[in-house]
Amino acid sequence: MAKDMTLLWGSGSPPCWRVMIVLEEKNLQAYNSKLLSFEKGEHKSAEVMSMNPRGQLPSFKHGSKVLNESYAACMYLESQFKSQGNKLIPDCPAEQAMMYQRMFEGLTLAQKMADVIYYSWKVPEAERHDSAVKRNKENLSTELKLWEEYLQKTSGSFVAGKSFSLADVSVFPGVAYLFRFGLTEERYPQLTAYYNSLKERPSIKASWPPTWLESPQGQDMLKDV
């Protein structure tokens, strides 16, 4: 079963991490795992391009089926192995609706986070503007306050109800990334409590980015958000 699965991934990538968390939650740890280096450009290798012509990670293969979008891979795994491991989509219609809502809202959070963190990496120096940096940080702050409210309503343990779900699989890696880049704990107490609670979950600990373990000290880019 898991031996028919291959995951090409990069350390610290939230999309890669999502798939790894689901594989852990569904007791599919025997999959073929291949860690590639973004720094060395290995995500553009022939092996990756043959599975994902976009040259992006993750790239997940189960038998002859290839899924290169992390949300798609996560939903596929839960669908195919519904009765194995931990259930990640609740049966209750109201909880399921909330799970899907928060899951896909996580994409907005990820985009606003990327607008800040990757701005200086993606925008040529001659085209950068302080006003854009300020605006992006303000947009991220507004988004984070929304998630603070969400977590307050759910008592902070999970983003979409009483149990760990695909919504948490989708959102947690991004939250961890935010704190890795210096998000202030005092300013976002609900997100801090959520992060500190879920980082101890076995599936998350088992898939923690190895580069983060090697270099626990992150950056302070988000200290003023």
Swiss-Prot record:
Enzyme class: transferase
GO biological process: glutathione metabolic process; L-phenylalanine catabolic process
List of residues binding glutathione: 18
Induction: By epoxides and by antioxidants.
Tissues expressing this chain: Found in all the tissues examined. Highest values found in liver and in intestinal mucosa.
Keyword Cytoplasm: yes
The reaction(s) this protein catalyses: RX + glutathione = an S-substituted glutathione + a halide anion + H(+)
GO cellular component, one term: mitochondrion
GO molecular function, one term: glutathione transferase activity
Superkingdom of source: Eukaryota
Compartment(s) where it occurs, according to its Swiss-Prot or TrEMBL record: Cytoplasm
Cited InterPro entries: Glutathione-S-Trfase_C-like, Glutathione-S-Trfase_C_sf, Glutathione_S-Trfase, Glutathione_S-Trfase_N, GST_C, Thioredoxin-like_sf
Domain GST N-terminal positions: 3-85
E.C. numbers: 2.5.1.18
Keywords from the named record: Cytoplasm, Transferase
Keyword GTP-binding: no
Entry-linked PROSITE patterns: GST_CTER, GST_NTER
Domain GST C-terminal as annotated: residue spans: 92-217
Cited function: Conjugation of reduced glutathione to a wide number of exogenous and endogenous hydrophobic electrophiles.
Assembly, per entry: Homodimer.
Family the UniProt entry places it in: Belongs to the GST superfamily. Theta family.
Name the record gives this protein: Glutathione S-transferase A
Annotated organism of origin: Pleuronectes platessa (European plaice)
